[in-house]
Amino acid sequence: IKKYNEILKESYYSSTLPIKNNLTESQVAKFIATKYKYPDVHLKHKFSRYYPKLKSGAHFIGHINRINKKDIKRLKKLGIFETYNGLDHIGKTGIEYFYEDKLHGLPGYKKIEVDAQNNVIRTIESVDPVHGKDIILNIDYKIQKIAEQAFVGYKGAMVALDPNNGEIIAYLSQPSYDPNLFTNGIDETSWKKLNNSIHKPLINRVVSGLYPPGSTI
């Protein structure tokens, strides 16, 4: 209940409250069989961000999370709040945050007429969504993995550039974290573990760490 109350506080503008994500086929079948008991609960197909590389590159890729009041205030100030109607998530850190306006696209919608039993009678209006743009980075994943392996057991930061053009081909902040934890709102236990860790995995040491310069030659 505490979790849902927190979601309600942050998502007061949304018309829906997610109870559970990523249902299995068995869970879907069980719900459908007993749906008559829960007239106000509905199944909904939904796209979800998944980071297949897990901790690898988490600090430059960043992550998304549920839209909160602070995000809404910023979106309204920028005059783009309307483009987020029907959306629940937004980029919070890294590339996800910096290129949010290009990644999120535009939501579609459908206006329908229903009867007293909530059965669809007809579609009044339908607008297809517009997909966000793809972003291709210059990161060389082989070099990225070599850097990560070299930093196992250590804390620090590393950036590798292509000397021919200055492109960033590896970007490492160690230790790292799994951005998938944040996608649908991080749970309290996981948050405390990350936030209270003496190793500070959430800090992007490339841009926020303070280190002596050492030799520049």
Where do the protein language model's features map onto the residues?
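Active-site rim segments in enzyme catalytic domains, especially the processed small/beta chain
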Residues: 212-216
